[in-house]
Amino acid sequence: MNSIVSKYTQSTNNDDPKKIIEEEGFTNRFDVVPVPQSSLYLRNLTDETKNKHCLIKMNHGTTTLAFRYQHGIVVCVDSRASAGPLIASQTVKKVIEINPYLLGTLAGGAADCQFWETVLGMECRLHQLRNKELISVSAASKILSNITYSYKGYGLSMGTMLAGTGKGGTALYYIDSDGTRLKGDLFSVGSGSTFAYGVLDSGYRWDLSKQEALYLAQRSIVAATHRDAYSGGSVNLYHIDENGWVFHGNFDVDSLIWEAKDNENSFAHIPR
């Protein structure tokens, strides 16, 4: 009993937080393979362009999109997870709710995106506690891009968007596993992004109403799921304004296709 009391009643002034975290087994780093050049070793195992006999083939696909307009930001994604030619799941949540004001999307390797965006969430919370204010989307995106750049060449697979509001207002950024960081008003990432862009480019404008923006995002994902075998399942729809993000629902792709066929006279090649 005395040992328990002493452990949890010591003054924190002399405690080293980093040491405590490492002793408890928690860390925001991961170990690399103990070989002379870890990046080359991992690339040889995962990069099919460098080694056609590679043991780990990172085949994946998805469709995610986000865009800014006059009333905020819309984020929309599908829910299919693929493992090469196989459908691993139809109910994957590809929007990571980092905090009530910031969302991250998932494209590429699910584990990489989930792990590092969880780490980002901890960093954002620490910033808020230290500075008594929300972190800006720009600063959050810079943290994530610095992390991914530090592991460039080590086999990470990430193509994520960060959308949110904070100090500096609403903003949208694209970050990938090479450390690339781009600010923009419209992005679509994943194997189905070409099809999503086809709808977005024809319907996007800055002065969209909120309902028009939500429908455009939803309709773009539907088009991508129809043409891209690696996208499908259902559509998850979010909206962000100065008060934070709001989840607008999960919608079945098949139902949305039939709805578009009836209301727009589109998908005419699909027989009843």
Swiss-Prot record:
One function term, GO molecular function aspect: threonine-type endopeptidase activity
E.C. number: 3.4.25.1
The organism's place on the tree of life at top rank: Eukaryota
Location in or out of the cell: Cytoplasm; Nucleus
GO biological-process terms attached to the record: proteasome-mediated ubiquitin-dependent protein catabolic process
GO terms for cellular component: cytosol; nuclear envelope; nucleus; proteasome core complex, beta-subunit complex
Classification via Gene3D superfamilies: Glutamine Phosphoribosylpyrophosphate, subunit 1, domain 1
Propiece residue ranges: 1-61
Main location: cytoplasm
CDD domains in UniProt: proteasome_beta_type_5
Keyword Ion transport: no
Active site: 62 (nucleophile)
Enzyme class, UniProt record, top EC level: hydrolase
Family as reported in the entry's similarity comment: Belongs to the peptidase T1B family.
Assembly and interaction partners: The 26S proteasome consists of a 20S proteasome core and two 19S regulatory subunits. The 20S proteasome core is composed of 28 subunits that are arranged in four stacked rings, resulting in a barrel-shaped structure. The two end rings are each formed by seven alpha subunits, and the two central rings are each formed by seven beta subunits. The catalytic chamber with the active sites is on the inside of the barrel.
Entry protein name: Probable proteasome subunit beta type-5
Organism from which the protein derives: Schizosaccharomyces pombe (strain 972 / ATCC 24843)
Organism classification: Eukaryota, Fungi, Dikarya, Ascomycota, Taphrinomycotina
